[in-house]
Amino acid sequence: MSQQDDHQQLVVFTLGAEHYALPIQAVNEIIRYSEPRSVASRTDWVRGVISLRGRIVPVYDVAARLGLRSELTEQSKIVIVEAGSETAGVIVDTV
């Protein structure tokens, strides 16, 4: 195993005052925040959906799910992540 194999590249982002990271392989892209179109949901952390190049992508407010205080600002982004055949957007404060 080479020394390079020991390092994993991460995308680091903030939710409230906390820092989190995702493996770069899981991140498809990072886009500027725009208000998702609302959908009927029983939870406050499902924010809605966006259209991304013809695909409907659900958007989640993970900060709300974790009970963290977070505000939308001009620096807010939506991180588009993929897991298997599923794609979703996650609202983050900064990247």
Locate predicted features:
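An acidic, low-aromatic, low-complexity terminal/linker signal
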Residues: 1-95
